[in-house]
Each structure stands twice: as structure tokens, then as C-alpha cells.
């Protein structure tokens, strides 16, 4: 069972915070995938984890800034399934190994919260191409107000080798924003 404490503590929290989750049938149950979403609030990872955990009972390994690493590796990496972004190469390689072993990895191509990058991060597309893994786009309207957050889950996207990685990343994020705006 993935996240036994999460199910006990955070299922009620997410139930109270998320108004609607659309298109959960698009979450593949027999395929490893890379989850890509927009990033609006600190709780976004919890909101994204909720439908994955309910449908698949699997951990979602999300690339995060190393803010909480004073709690220790056991809590952050093993229990919470975070991938610390100490440096780009380390996070990329760790994500790649997790994907190759059948795990689900979550990435926010916009960069860190509160710092909207003009240039999107291309790691999700590069990982998808290198590991031959599809991307699951999720549009998220995130809120701290109860019954106000919504998720819209898109269909799998298969990035193409040999095509411009930046353009593919932009196309995936346009789909994420379309999903977010059409909830």
C-alpha cells in the first residue's frame, strides 16, 4: 500500500479541497508515465497525487526544491517520494532511473513556485523521449479555499525523437493550460 498515512490524513483534506476531478479514465493503469502539470500553490503535489493514488495505489515521485530536506532522506525521498532538485543532472538521472523501474514521475515544467520562468524546463520531454515513456498532462486550478480546486486530466502524449524539444514542451504546456482553463 502506497502512502498509508497519506490515505488516513490527506484523503479527507483532498476531499474537502478538490471540487472536481475530470477524466480520471485517462490515467493509464498498465503504463508507466510522466505526469506534467502547471504549478500554482504549495499544495499542488498533494492535489496531483490524489487521483493517482485513488486509481493506481502507486507513489508519485515529484521533483521538488530541497526545502524540507532537513527532515532527512528517509522521510523526504522514501516516505514522501520526492526527488530533490539539488542540481539538474542529479534530479534528471534519478527521475530517469525511477521511470526505467516502472515508477511514475511528476514534473512542473514552469519551474519553481512563485518564479514563473519565461523559458519552460524541457526535462519532461527529454525524459519521455529517452525512456520511451508517454506524458500525462493535467490542468490544475489550485486553491486554498475548500471545494475550490479542480483537476482536468488529459490524454497521453508521446513526444517524438528528432523534433524540437522546446517546441514539444511548449505544446504540452499549451495542452495543460487548455485543460486547466476548460474545467
Segments predicted by a language model, with ranges:
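Short acidic-hydrophobic, aromatic-tinged amphipathic segments that line or gate anion-handling sites
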Residues: 21-23, 82-87, 159
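Non-catalytic C-terminal accessory region of glycerolipid acyltransferases
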Residues: 31, 90-183
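A generic structural signal for well-ordered alpha-helical segments
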Residues: 14, 55, 77, 98, ...
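Short, Lys/Arg-enriched, disordered terminal segments
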Residues: 1-11, 24-25, 101, 178-183
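Structural motif corresponding to alpha-helix initiation and N-cap regions
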Residues: 21, 70, 89-92
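Helix-to-loop junction immediately C-terminal to a conserved catalytic motif
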Residues: 8-39
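Short hydrophobic helices that act as membrane-entry/anchoring signals
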Residues: 2-18, 73, 77-82
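Catalytic core of membrane glycerolipid acyltransferases/transacylases, capturing the structured
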Residues: 29-87
Amino acid at each position: 500500500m502506497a502512502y498509508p498515512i497519506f490515505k488516513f490524513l490527506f484523503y479527507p483534506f483532498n476531499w474537502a479541497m478538490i471540487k472536481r476531478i475530470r477524466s480520471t479514465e485517462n490515467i493509464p493503469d498498465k503504463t508507466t508515465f510522466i505526469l506534467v502539470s502547471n504549478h500554482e500553490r504549495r499544495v499542488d503535489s498533494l492535489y496531483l497525487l490524489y487521483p493517482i493514488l485513488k486509481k493506481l495505489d502507486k507513489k508519485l515521485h515529484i521533483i521538488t526544491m530541497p526545502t524540507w530536506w532537513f527532515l532527512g532522506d528517509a522521510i523526504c525521498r522514501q516516505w514522501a517520494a520526492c526527488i530533490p532538485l539539488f542540481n539538474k543532472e542529479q534530479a534528471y538521472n534519478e527521475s530517469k532511473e525511477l521511470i526505467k523501474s516502472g515508477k511514475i514521475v511528476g514534473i512542473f515544467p514552469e519551474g519553481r513556485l512563485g518564479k514563473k520562468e519565461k523559458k519552460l524546463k524541457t526535462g519532461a520531454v527529454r525524459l519521455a523521449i529517452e525512456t520511451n515513456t508517454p506524458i500525462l498532462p493535467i490542468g490544475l486550478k489550485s486553491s486554498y479555499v475548500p471545494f475550490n480546486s479542480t483537476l482536468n486530466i488529459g490524454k497521453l502524449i508521446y513526444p517524438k525523437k528528432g523534433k524540437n524539444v522546446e517546441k514539444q514542451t511548449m505544446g504540452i504546456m499549451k495542452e495543460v493550460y487548455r485543460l486547466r482553463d476548460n474545467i
